[in-house]
Swiss-Prot record:
Keywords: Allosteric enzyme, Glycosyltransferase, GTP-binding, Magnesium, Nucleotide-binding, Transferase. Belongs to the UPRTase family. It is an enzyme of class 2 (transferase). 5-phospho-alpha-D-ribose 1-diphosphate binds at R79, R104, D131, P132, M133, L134, A135, T136, G137, G138, S139, D200. Catalyzes the conversion of uracil and 5-phospho-alpha-D-ribose 1-diphosphate (PRPP) to UMP and diphosphate. GO terms for molecular function: GTP binding; magnesium ion binding; uracil phosphoribosyltransferase activity. Its cofactor is Mg(2+). This is Uracil phosphoribosyltransferase. It catalyses: UMP + diphosphate = 5-phospho-alpha-D-ribose 1-diphosphate + uracil. It comes from Streptococcus pneumoniae serotype 4 (strain ATCC BAA-334 / TIGR4).
Length: 209
C-alpha cells in the first residue's frame, strides 16, 4: 500500500480552518490555498538531492550545499489545481508546469480527460500532481495513469483535504505514488463531497460554478 503523509504543522492547520469556513471570501480562499501549498512544499520537497558547491563569502571561500539540479514538474489537475501551483513555484521557480484537464461526466459521474499539456521530457522529471481535493480518487488516478502512459515514474500527489475513500482508491491503483495532504477528513457524502471538507474548491477559488 502506498505511503500517505498528513502534514500537521500548526500554521497549515490554522489556515486550513479558515479555508473551510463558508464565510471565507473568494479572494481570501485563493490566497489561503496559495499559502498552504507553499507551506506544504517544505515537507513535500524534503528529499530533493543536494550537492556541494564552492562559494566565496565576504570572509572566505567555503563549500556549501545547493540543489543538485534535479528536474521537477508541477502538474495541476484543472481547474482547481491551478490554485496550488504558485505556492510551490515560489520554492522551486525552475520547475516546469504541465496541465491535465478533466470534467465529470454527468451520467457516469466518472472523470473525463480533455486536455494534457506536459513538458516533453516528463519521463525524466520528478512530478508533483496537485489538486486541492482527493475525494473519490477518480481524477487523481486518471491523472497518474496519463502521466505513466507518457513514461513518468517518479510521481507524488499533493492535496489540501482528502477522504479515506479517495486515499484508498489511489493507493490501490498506484501504490508507488506518495500522497501528501493537510487533512484526512471523515468520509464522502452521498454526493461525493468530502465531509467536513470545504465545498467545491474550484467554485470557491474562481467564484464561478
Amino acid at each position: 500500500m502506498g505511503k500517505i503523509e498528513v502534514i500537521n504543522h500548526p500554521l497549515i492547520q490554522h489556515k486550513l480552518s479558515i479555508l473551510r469556513r463558508t464565510d471565507t471570501s473568494t479572494k481570501a480562499f485563493r490566497e489561503l490555498v496559495d499559502e498552504i501549498a507553499m507551506l506544504m512544499g517544505y515537507e513535500v520537497l524534503r528529499d530533493l538531492p543536494l550537492e556541494d558547491v564552492e562559494i566565496e563569502t565576504p570572509i572566505t571561500k567555503t563549500v556549501q550545499k545547493q540543489l543538485a539540479g534535479k528536474k521537477l514538474a508541477i502538474v495541476p489537475i484543472l481547474r482547481a489545481g491551478i490554485g496550488m501551483v504558485d505556492g510551490l513555484l515560489n520554492l522551486v521557480p525552475a520547475a516546469k508546469v504541465g496541465h491535465i484537464g478533466m470534467y465529470r461526466d454527468e451520467e457516469t459521474l466518472q472523470p473525463v480527460e480533455y486536455l494534457v499539456k506536459l513538458p516533453e521530457d516528463i519521463d525524466q522529471r520528478q512530478i508533483f500532481v496537485v489538486d486541492p481535493m482527493l475525494a473519490t480518487g477518480g481524477s487523481a488516478i486518471l491523472a497518474v495513469d496519463s502521466l505513466k502512459k507518457r513514461g513518468a515514474s517518479n510521481i507524488k500527489f499533493v492535496c489540501l483535504v482528502s477522504a479515506p475513500e479517495g486515499v484508498k482508491a489511489l493507493q490501490e491503483a498506484h501504490p508507488d505514488v506518495e500522497i501528501f495532504t493537510a487533512a484526512l477528513d471523515e468520509r464522502l457524502n452521498e454526493h461525493g463531497y468530502i465531509v467536513p471538507g470545504l465545498g467545491d474548491a474550484g467554485d470557491r477559488l474562481f467564484g464561478t460554478k
